[in-house]
Design a protein with these regions (language model features):
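Well-ordered alpha-helical segments within folded domains of soluble proteins
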Residues: 89-94
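Short Gly/Pro-enriched turn/cap motifs at secondary-structure boundaries
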Residues: 86-87, 113, 128-131, 155-158, ...
């Protein structure tokens, strides 16, 4: 396996890093304190090619791979996890569509995303169904050449700004996971009711809402794949997107470590920087170790899917490890900064 990034990947990393440093970091505090949705930042990310990177060239897209997404994601999450979540949410919504949709759907809904700024949302999670996707209760009943959708979704990123949703439904409740079907649903369709914006720690400017579908009529041709294939398509989408989710934790952890190093080198106690105390320096060394390990897990999972290998196990391991690693490093960063670690005037509190 080649561990070095290609020249194109290095350029992509540098582009994302520059954008995070110049466009995201300076605005992160404002958006976290106000909760204002960073629409202008998202539009700039779209303009320079950091969004929708997996759309196929035949639909005017860049056709990039999952490793490219991982490279971009680490830098954007280093800048601000909430803004990165909003910027990269399209990837999750697009994944099942790119995997399972026919060309008509891609021309109607996907190709326009390369021509003008548009957002999409992945509407799968429900109050009683998160990782247990087969437990969804949202229904879709066929009536003529339409399906009528009823049900509720929750924790839907970019819901209030999305132009369309990928919605997972049950078309045959008696068939278990084989009775699940996905649809693309235009957000302007009558019967869609938006819930209130949720205010989440570290994610205050990300637009996360519940969605209720009341007799929402969707043309049958907007079905993703065939009836009953929704669960399989959704699981395949997770294999593609979990490395990108996991690397977000690496980016946040890296930011926490850098803030810790900066503070530990400038904060003096008993006549010397606290970095010279082994209790601090060992803690930061462990941060660096775990960040490197997490990044490699993400790269491995992305490389596997890019090269035709099933990565379900590796992607799940990466997501599990990186989430716990990030939580631990951010907690340690608060300890390094002491009282400043949980003060809103300092960046570690938000992480």
């Amino acid at each position: 396996m080649e561990f070095a990034l290609s020249s194109e990947q290095k350029e992509l990393r540098d582009l994302a890093r520059k954008f995070a440093k110049e466009e995201i970091r300076p605005k992160a505090e404002h958006h976290d304190h106000t909760g204002e949705y960073p629409l202008a930042v998202l539009k700039k990310a779209w303009e320079i090619g950091l969004m929708n990177i997996h759309i196929e060239p035949r639909f005017n897209g860049a056709g990039m791979q999952e490793l490219d997404d991982v490279i971009i994601g680490e830098e954007l999450f280093w800048g601000c996890s909430a803004m990165a979540t909003a910027i990269l949410a399209n990837n999750l919504a697009l994944a099942p569509v790119l995997l399972g949709a026919n060309d008509r759907i891609k021309k109607e809904f996907v190709q326009p995303m390369t021509e003008e700024f548009k957002l999409a949302a992945y509407a799968v999670t429900e109050p009683g169904a998160g990782s247990d996707v087969a437990a969804i209760r949202t229904s879709a009943k066929k009536v003529g050449d339409e399906y009528i959708i009823n049900g509720s979704k929750m924790w839907i990123t970019n819901a209030g700004y999305a132009d369309w949703f990928f919605v997972l439904t049950k078309t045959d409740p008696s068939a278990g996971h084989k009775g699940i079907t996905g649809f693309i649903v235009d957000s302007k369709t009558p019967g869609i009711i938006m819930g209130k914006k949720e205010i989440n720690m570290g994610q205050k400017c990300s637009d996360t809402r519940g969605i209720t579908f009341e007799d929402v009529k969707v043309p049958a041709w907007q079905m993703i794949g065939r009836e009953g294939e929704g669960f399989k398509i959704a699981m395949g989408a997770f294999d593609h997107t979990r490395p990108g989710v996991a690397i977000g934790a690496v980016g946040v952890a890296r930011a926490a470590m850098e803030h810790s190093i900066q503070y530990a080198n400038t904060r003096n106690t008993f006549g010397r920087p606290i970095m010279e105390n082994q209790g601090i320096s060992f803690m930061i060394a462990e941060m660096a170790r775990d960040i490197e390990a997490g990044r490699l897990l993400c790269y491995q999972a992305a490389w596997m899917i890019d090269n035709g290998f099933r990565n379900t196990y590796q992607a799940s391991i990466a997501k599990m490890f990186c989430a716990d690693m990030c939580m631990r490093i951010c907690t340690d960063a608060v300890q390094v900064l002491g009282g400043y670690g949980f003060n809103t005037e300092y960046p570690v509190e938000k992480l």
